[in-house]
Regions:
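Basic, amphipathic "hinge/linker" alpha-helix immediately C-terminal to the N-terminal HTH DNA-binding motif
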Residues: 71-92, 96
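N-terminal helix-turn-helix DNA-binding core of bacterial DNA-binding proteins
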Residues: 7-50, 69-71, 76-80
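Short beta-strand "wing" residues that participate in macromolecule-binding interfaces
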Residues: 66
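Short amphipathic alpha-helical "recognition" segments used for binding
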Residues: 43, 52, 114-116
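Short, hydrophobic-biased segments on the C-terminal half of alpha helices
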Residues: 55-56
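Glycine-centered, phosphate/nucleic-acid-interacting loop/turn motifs that mediate DNA/RNA or nucleotide
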Residues: 62
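Amphipathic alpha-helical dimerization/coiled-coil segments
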Residues: 2-7, 26, 87-126
Length: 126
């Protein structure tokens, strides 16, 4: 009996696959202390409303934590990756890397088998 190989696309979680959410999660990965709403808005190039909508979806999925506080008598929202979010996003990135390598390999073989080492070298550097 042969087993069917796992679909590599099944691990691409929809919550992360939207480009703005991918940007938000990527920005948060580099900040152990979280990012303020305004820092995230600037880094990701989003409007207040657009960022709020995506943060709500990520919060409902429990992949981020949102802390609201007053700093110098002004409200401040800070966003952090949750432990689950960090783990799930890393799994997503590994799955995405596998899908991209598979696509690059298919394109290299279709174009010119001799270019395969060059393309795989570029993928490895990313």
């Amino acid at each position: 009996m042969t087993t069917k190989p796992e679909n590599p696309y099944s691990a691409l979680e929809r919550i992360f696959h939207e480009p703005n959410r991918l940007a938000i999660m990527s920005a948060l990965c580099g900040s152990a202390n979280g990012l303020t709403f305004n820092e995230l808005k600037e880094e990701c190039g989003l409007t207040d409303g657009n960022l709020s909508r995506h943060l709500k979806a990520l919060d409902e999925a429990k992949v981020i934590k949102i802390k609201k506080a007053f700093v110098s008598s002004k409200p401040q929202t800070t966003v952090f990756l949750s432990d689950t979010g960090r783990e799930n996003f890393l799994e997503y990135l590994v799955a995405l890397e596998g899908v991209l390598k598979k696509a690059a390999l298919a394109m290299a073989l279709e174009k010119k088998p001799a270019s395969l080492p060059s393309i795989l070298g570029k993928i490895a550097r990313v």
